[in-house]
Amino acid sequence: NSANPCCDPVTCKPRRGEHCVSGPCCRNCKFLNAGTICRYARGDDMNDYCTGVTSDCPRNPYKS
């Protein structure tokens, strides 16, 4: 949407020079650094971390 400063108002894709529009691993139109916690552990699960190359928060492979 045009209210998002990361979003091209016509295509709603990231503006030139920006990495992302939204997501748990996107802040200020840039991907968060690899290793940034994007989902905290619950119970026996482990934390999930940003990869530095996507705005998504991948699930760790050890999810119980």
UniProtKB/Swiss-Prot annotation:
Tissue specificity remark: Expressed by the venom gland.
Keyword Disulfide bond part of the UniProt annotation: yes
Disulfide bonds listed in the record: 6-29, 20-26, 25-50, 38-57
Domain of life of the organism encoding this protein: Eukaryota
GO molecular function, one term: toxin activity
Residues of the Disintegrin domain: 1-64
One cellular component term from this protein's GO annotations in UniProt: extracellular region
Assigned keywords, A-Z: Cell adhesion impairing toxin, Disulfide bond, Hemostasis impairing toxin, Platelet aggregation inhibiting toxin, Secreted, Toxin
Subcellular compartments: Secreted
Sequence motif: Cell attachment site, positions: 42-44
UniProt-listed InterPro entries: Disintegrin_CS (IPR018358), Disintegrin_dom (IPR001762), Disintegrin_dom_sf (IPR036436)
Main location as per UniProt: secreted
Membership in a protein family: Belongs to the venom metalloproteinase (M12B) family. P-II subfamily. P-IId sub-subfamily.
Subunit annotation: Homodimer; disulfide-linked.
Note in the entry: The disintegrin belongs to the dimeric disintegrin subfamily.
Function: Poor inhibitor of platelet aggregation. The disintegrin inhibits the adhesion of cells expressing the RGD-dependent integrin alpha-5/beta-1 (ITGA5/ITGB1) to immobilized fibronectin. Inhibition on alpha-IIb/beta-3 (ITGA2B/ITGB3) is low, and there is no inhibition on alpha-1/beta-1 (ITGA1/ITGB1), alpha-2/beta-1 (ITGA2/ITGB1) and alpha-6/beta-1 (ITGA6/ITGB1).
The protein, known as: Disintegrin VA6
